[in-house]
A protein has these predicted regions:
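N-terminal amphipathic alpha-helix/helix-capping segment at the start of soluble metabolic enzymes
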Residues: 1-18, 129-137
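Hydrophobic faces of well-ordered beta-strands that scaffold small-molecule active sites
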Residues: 17-19, 40-42, 68-70, 91-93, ...
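Glycine-rich, proline-tolerant flexible connector loops at the mouths of alpha/beta enzymes
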Residues: 28, 33-56, 172-187
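A short alpha/beta connector and helix-capping loop motif
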Residues: 50-76, 80-81, 104-106
Length: 211
């Protein structure tokens, strides 16, 4: 199976340079893919992109060394599995607030016995290779978004979820959750980020923080 360059960079303790795609355009995706990013995330939550747009965008990204990722619009297994089948190599999942939700997300990305992903990777076999099923559980990047008050209260249990590769702070929703307007420079925002960093330090396995 084609290696996930983004996961390899993380395992080597380095930063992944990730771009963001919110416009449903193959030309936009193709142009961005030529700019030297490590990965590009197709935003299916707050972007204007749906599945029919996302699949051809991943096709043009796949003509380069850039890793195609997607932010889905919810922790919904059917959508997660469908975009993975289309050749997506990593999922950013919004609104993960506790261990149960984190496990639901991770297991939707994994084939049995470690998850419940249904097999039918259509374009995933073309992009990933004929041995896709043997390695997909390990190669797919799984990132949970921390952006609710409940998530702040359950940081350690979320971050210690087996198979979760990292977290992604949703700063706007997190600000709203703690009673602030969206932003980065308020005291309460800084306090929340500090809590997240402390939890990262306390868990046994390295987890990458993005925002």
């Amino acid at each position: 199976m084609r290696k996930n360059k983004a996961k390899e960079i993380i395992k080597n303790g380095k930063a992944v340079i990730n771009g963001w795609l919110q416009i449903p355009s193959t030309v936009s995706a193709e142009t961005m893919a030529q700019q030297g990013w490590d990965s590009l995330t197709i935003d299916m939550q707050h972007g204007l992109v749906d599945y029919t747009n996302a699949m051809p965008m991943m096709q043009v990204i796949s003509a380069t060394e850039v890793v195609p990722l997607a932010r889905v619009n919810w922790n919904e297994p059917g959508q997660i599995m469908k975009i993975l089948d289309a050749g997506c190599y990593g999922i950013i999942c919004p609104m993960v607030s506790n261990r149960k939700e984190a496990e639901r997300f991770v297991q939707a990305c994994k084939y049995p016995p470690h998850g419940y992903r249904s097999f039918g990777p259509m374009r995933g076999l073309i992009y990933g290779g004929p041995d896709y099923v043997d390695h997909a559980n390990d190669e797919i990047l799984k990132m949970a978004m921390i952006e609710t008050k409940e998530a702040l209260e359950n940081l350690d249990e979320i971050m210690s979820t087996p198979g979760l590769d990292g977290i992604y702070i949703g700063p706007a929703d997190l600000s709203l959750a703690i009673g602030e307007k969206p932003g980065f420079d308020k005291d309460e925002d800084t306090k929340a980020y500090s809590e997240i960093l402390l939890s990262l330090i306390h868990i046994s396995e390295p987890t990458r923080l993005d925002h």
